[in-house]
A protein has these predicted regions:
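RNase H-like nuclease fold core
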Residues: 1-47, 55-62, 66
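Hydrophobic (often cysteine-bearing) scaffold residues that line and stabilize catalytic clefts
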Residues: 48-49, 118
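RNase H catalytic domain
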Residues: 11-15, 54-126, 130-132
Length: 132
C-alpha cells in the first residue's frame, strides 16, 4: 500500500465548548483500516478541526505508507496548510506546525477540501465521541 487517505472532522458544541474529533483512515480503494473518535476537552471548532487532522495523521503513520492525502471539510485548516490563509489566532500556529511535521514524514502528501457530505464518516465518528 503506497497511499493512505485520512478523512478528518472536528466538532464543537457551543464554540467555545466541548470538542470532539473523528477520523477515518482508508486505503486508496476506500477500505477503512482504522478510526479515531475522541473527546478533546474545551475549545473552539478550529482547535477541534486541527485536533482531528493531527490524530488522524498520527494513526495513519502506523501503516508505513509513502504518501498521504488528508481530506477535510474545514476550508480554514486546508488553506492554512497550503499557505493560502495566514494564521491569525496564536493558538492555531503550534497545531499547524505539528501537523506539518507529521505529514512531512511522508514522501508525498496532499490536502483536499471536501464537501461535508464526502466527510460524513469522520463526522459520524466525532459525534460518536459525544455519545450520539
Amino acid at each position: 500500500m503506497s497511499l493512505i487517505i485520512v478523512y478528518a472532522d472536528g466538532a464543537c458544541r457551543g464554540n467555545p465548548g466541548p470538542m470532539a474529533i473523528g477520523a477515518s483512515i482508508q486505503t486508496a480503494e476506500g477500505v477503512e483500516l482504522s478510526t479515531v473518535s475522541a473527546l478533546l476537552g474545551q475549545g473552539t471548532n478550529n482547535l477541534a478541526e486541527y485536533g482531528a487532522a493531527i490524530a488522524g495523521v498520527r494513526k495513519a503513520i502506523e501503516y508505513g505508507t509513502d504518501a498521504i492525502e488528508l481530506r477535510m471539510d474545514s476550508q480554514l485548516v486546508v488553506k492554512q496548510l497550503t499557505g493560502e490563509f495566514q494564521i491569525r489566532k496564536a493558538d492555531l500556529k503550534p497545531l499547524l506546525n505539528e501537523l506539518l511535521t507529521l505529514i512531512g514524514q511522508y514522501k508525498a502528501w496532499s490536502v483536499t477540501h471536501v464537501r461535508r457530505e464526502q466527510n460524513q464518516r469522520a463526522d459520524e465518528l466525532a459525534n460518536l465521541a459525544y455519545g450520539y
